[in-house]
């Protein structure tokens, strides 16, 4: 992969190298314990959490006795970087904040108190991956304290620890690796990636090339799927490039768009100087990796690779301005000796300076690409096992509802949770079906789940009374299980089972197996089950997803009963620059600014046939953005755009489906 060892270690390096190792998230504590046991003088690295604007509002509200619901009313839509002294401007510029009652009582009191504590230290937390290793007792250098799990943690944060010259290692918890392991374990045959090459597998290539990568590590976000389609990624090298150019440093500089155009032959490949062609020809003359800084500094200024790595490190987010000036003079003088014209060498330096601090290490990008290819292979060949693992590990860009719908689009049957069949985790009950795990049921404790799985080994539950007697769940647990359908098929309707559970829980706790009420449970009348729409709503409330149909079915919209005049997501490829009307629930979003500094928004909506991307340019965002405070569903009128074969919708009008299709359209 043409990785530069000097990026890791070189003679001129004054500090320890960067060591980042990813492990499955559910084994990270095990690996930390291993490092503590093996190297002894070890501590986790702390981070110092401060009260941001939203956390200051929450803490102030709680201290003043307000409910979480009241506090969330003003915090949930505020930007994380909101300035509490400038809330009026936020309300005027961000549509979702337009109706927030900043001036009304009691919110004005909460805000006044929050202003006084915003920015103050809140507590010591633990760095997401960092730990420090020493050759002597760490307490000789750093004060320590214990974490709730019993590990020792530094009271200094990352930068002072590095300044002390100690070895820092990042052991990162990665859910994507756990997904891979769980999928392989679930498949009823051995999958050996030392013998299988996902890169050359046709089904895997097609899945990546077409951007059908929801659930796949690192390559599932809307922006990344869009990029995969634009590049028509067909090799490990190109996926490695894509993993880097999606990063903020390359993307925000305009280099990502230049890379796409040059890759597709729509823009000529140019170089600021012929020497750059020697080192940047594979990336169309564009720096996209940290290693590119090393190569350019070496080729243009004659710097050694070790010296060039020192330059790159100095340009990181933790800049040393005095050393930066030294490196700048060294670079420009070296470039001058190599005959580079002044204007050209200054322009090359400007490119390096604006890029180096936010670029991606190629070794990191290549490692990510390898895991991404394996994930794509598993999704292409074992979709049920793969999607069950994604749902179980609760990782990724989307919520469980989006992954359930993706599984449904793959032809996988979604089976609701059931006390006689479900495990704790999601699992593939057969090659084309996923059974929802009891872990997804709200209000259900892990101890109750474990009790259900253990006790039913002695015999399945025959009735609601049998279940209540053997498991003795809390009333809230029994109610949630009934409403989500986990007790369906036990001979009674949901309302009848709920009444029986209610009566059973009103008995004397020490005598629950014997009737102590005048009402005989056996005489409870049978009530009919609720309609399907009510069941669907109950699934949303108890599972935070819909097991039996897409959420828009609540409004009578299904593939078989599609409203006239509406375009499905799967049919967007048939249109180009056409005006259409579409509908969907909100899956995710991204706010950004134009080059003029105006706010705009990208949103991802989903109908039963797929996810589609919608662009709200500043004028439309200001006009309709205020309704984007919930998940929808929404109706969008707009124009379908064709961007290098990828279809998106540019919104011209946005409305809420909650008001009814006919009234919204009119």
Residue map of PLM features:
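OB-fold/S1-family single-stranded nucleic acid-binding modules
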Residues: 641-664
